[in-house]
Amino acid sequence: MTKQHDLDFVDKLGMYKIYDKWPEIAQSAFNSDSEEISFDEIDHIVFAGMGGSGAIGDLFSSILSKSNIHVSTVKGYLLPKTVDKNTLVITTSVSGNTDETLTVLSNAKKLDCNLIAFFSGGKMEEYCKKNHVDYRKLNLIHSPRASFVNFTYSILKTLGSTLPIEKNGVLESIREITNTRNHISSLNLSESNPALTLANWISGVPLIYYPHGLQSSAIRFKASLQENAKTHAIIEDLIESCHNGVVAWERPSIIQPILLRGQDDYIKTKERFEIIKEYFIKNNIEFKEIFSVSGNILTKIINLIYLLDYTSIYYSVLSNIDPSPVNSIEFIKSRTINP
């Protein structure tokens, strides 16, 4: 198992220390004195962002999936054609310099829609000040991916009167990540740590199966493994994969299945998980199951992300790979011209 010395030696910028503080960061963001902004008669919300910022849009898309508000996520340059005066476009770029999101911001400003931006500075701040766009400037904490809860709970606070998300549900999610920390943080580097146990199990390429409601957790886990552990990872919708992807298991491979499950998944989804487990057992394919905590959808997803992000950090340390540098991303950015 990983030791404290290993974390400090490999994780040179101390990413894990930020994750140890996630509950306090979330609480501080939601309790901030930031003024709420209300947008009336909104029936369509567009979340635009890339990478760690884009994961925030995935989260809100899942949370609002059963509301009367249609949610679009944009991970690229183009807004949906359905944007109108009843649309709220939320652009998030932790760095404030994301080329794609700056383009969306500029295009949204030209339309008859509502608009707000969240960032830590950069060109997005300059644009919003110059063009009188509502915005919130937030702290960058280590990296965009580590800043996830700071931005998520700041958005929940700022748009509390616009987003149909109960305050009690938000507070529940913070309580639960506080409880989760007791099991997965660096203060519990033992076999009882589920994040560390999963990290120790991974040796090949993880294939993450998810039910539709937990899609944002799966997307985030894939990205965290890619950025932190510098390894490939695959995600598949459980139900869809049973109509195609499952056939690939007929050949030997280094792929390792991980099943993400909710405590109260739809009955047909539960049945399908049991069927695919039966298939894996019959064919001697080792797999892992990861269950969400109980609670509202925000609570479930945030806690899964917390556990799985930590898994990616532990896996990177076990692989002797510093989780912080993302040199390949910097290469791409250096050749991308912002508008």
Residue ranges and their predicted role:
Residues P23-Q27, S61, T152-L159, I219-Q226, ...:
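Predominant activation on well-ordered alpha-helical scaffold segments within soluble catalytic domains
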Residues S324-P339:
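Short, small/acidic-rich helices and loops at N termini and domain boundaries
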Residues D40-N182, G262-I267, E271-K288:
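Glycine-rich phosphate-binding loops that contact phosphosugars or nucleotide phosphates
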Residues V10, K17, K21, A55, ...:
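Conserved active-site and cofactor/substrate-binding residues in soluble primary-metabolism enzymes
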Residues M1-K12:
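Polybasic, low-complexity association/targeting segments
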Residues V71-G76, T231-C242, E286-G295:
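A generic structural motif
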Residues D11-I18, I25-D33, I37, D43-H44, ...:
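Active-site phosphate/pyrophosphate-binding segments
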Residues V247-N327:
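C-terminal active-site/capping subdomain that shapes the small-molecule cofactor and substrate pocket
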